[in-house]
């Protein structure tokens, strides 16, 4: 049984790609048709590739892989943080800092500074410092938490990276590829899929679509870690939907 049903994908709008003029021709094989100037993603492939992504992430988690979720666009930020946390993994959901992976030593120093500031507050150091200095420390902590809070406890460079919108996260993807880190990604019709190891063709601009796919990969991690079925966020629907039904839905939505 597929980990995500066609019905779920349709309900969350996963099939809607970008305007045809914004497409990347390399995504042609994942496009089913075009309706009213919008590319429609072939959800039969999405179902199959989501299964592959699930199995890959589950098996990686079973081998204690460190998995980093990346999604800095506003539609992805909340789901990326929530689902990575639920799965006991790590995330970056604000701006990707260049060198986060390729200059990991420097990033670790910034994380150490964040932990130091937190420790100063916990130990009461803030109580004896001038208010102006405390304000500066709080400002520094807030900035560090914003960009690095999701990887504060990441023990090492990740073994796998999951990305929402590799078109936007090109720097992150390039760093991962440079280090040989496999990338699983939601890839829309405007993106270049070449650097992605496991492609999930999907609308990466709809919050519900991002939540559906991201939650399913979090389920995969939980299952891999527990060695049993996860308490899944989205129940699989066994009802099969034909490709013709997809067209009917798309035409209805674009009418």
Swiss-Prot record:
Keywords, ordered alphabetically: Ribonucleoprotein, Ribosomal protein
Transmembrane stretches, start-end: none
Keyword RNA-binding among UniProt keywords: no
Alphabetized CDD domains for the sequence: RPS2
InterPro entries per UniProt: Ribosomal_uS2, Ribosomal_uS2_bac/mit/plastid, Ribosomal_uS2_CS, Ribosomal_uS2_flav_dom_sf
NCBIfam families found in the cross-reference section: rpsB_bact (TIGR01011)
Name of the protein in question: Small ribosomal subunit protein uS2
Source organism of the structure: Streptococcus pyogenes serotype M49 (strain NZ131)
Encoding gene (name): rpsB
């Amino acid at each position: 049984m597929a980990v995500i049903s066609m019905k779920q994908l349709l309900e969350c709008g996963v099939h809607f790609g970008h305007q045809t003029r914004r497409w990347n021709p390399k995504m042609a094989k994942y496009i089913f048709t075009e309706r009213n100037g919008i590319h429609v993603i072939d959800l039969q492939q999405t179902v199959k590739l989501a299964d592959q992504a699930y199995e890959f992430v589950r098996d990686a988690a079973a081998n204690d892989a460190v998995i980093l979720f990346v999604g800095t666009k506003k539609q992805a930020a909340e789901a990326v943080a929530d689902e990575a946390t639920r799965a006991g993994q790590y995330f970056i959901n604000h701006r990707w800092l260049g060198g986060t992976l390729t200059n990991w030593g420097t990033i670790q120093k910034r994380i150490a500074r964040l932990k130091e500031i937190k420790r100063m507050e916990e130990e009461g150091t803030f109580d004896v410092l001038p208010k102006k200095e405390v304000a500066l420390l709080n400002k520094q902590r807030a900035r560090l938490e914003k960009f690095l809070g999701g990887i504060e406890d990441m023990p090492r460079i990740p073994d796998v990276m999951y990305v929402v919108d590799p078109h936007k996260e090109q720097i992150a993807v390039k760093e991962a590829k440079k280090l040989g880190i496999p990338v699983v990604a939601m890839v829309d019709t405007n993106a270049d899929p070449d650097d992605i190891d496991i492609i999930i063709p999907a609308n990466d601009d709809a919050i519900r679509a991002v939540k559906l796919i991201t939650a399913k990969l979090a389920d995969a991690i939980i299952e891999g870690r527990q060695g049993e079925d996860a308490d899944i966020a989205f129940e699989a629907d066994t009802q099969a939907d034909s490709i013709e039904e997809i067209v009917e839905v798309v035409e209805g939505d674009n009418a």
